[in-house]
């Protein structure tokens, strides 16, 4: 598995500035949360193009759009339910009717120790 840095388009522009195209958006949201310490729980949404420097393959393009929501700063499971309900309504409003929701859980800290 490659890191986002390895998959990042980076280059110098005509002015000699070093630029990079974002490979995904979650890291930027988490960084903003860590730097600005907003009130919690903190909810954010984003949408936009992303770029990955990798061999193009079926279902994995170099440029793609990402829509996402993040809810940070709490372990309240109701916030997870809120995010799932938001996604469900989003797909419904797009007119998608053949949606199947499968829910799984990593468990809590004690549960995960059993799988290490």
Task: Describe the predicted segments one by one.
Residues 1-116:
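TRNA-recognition modules of translation machinery and tRNA-sensing kinases, especially anticodon-binding
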């Amino acid at each position: 598995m490659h890191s986002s840095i390895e998959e990042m388009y980076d280059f110098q522009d005509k002015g000699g500035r070093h630029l990079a195209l974002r490979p995904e958006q979650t890291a930027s949201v988490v960084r903003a949360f860590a730097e600005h310490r907003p009130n919690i729980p903190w909810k954010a949404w984003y949408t936009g193009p992303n770029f990955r420097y990798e061999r193009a393959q079926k279902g994995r393009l170099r440029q793609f759009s990402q829509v996402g929501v993040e809810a940070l700063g709490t372990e309240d499971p109701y916030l997870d339910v809120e995010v799932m309900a938001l996604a469900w309504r989003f797909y419904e409003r797009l007119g998608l009717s053949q949606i199947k929701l499968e829910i799984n859980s990593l468990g809590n800290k004690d549960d995960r120790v059993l799988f290490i």
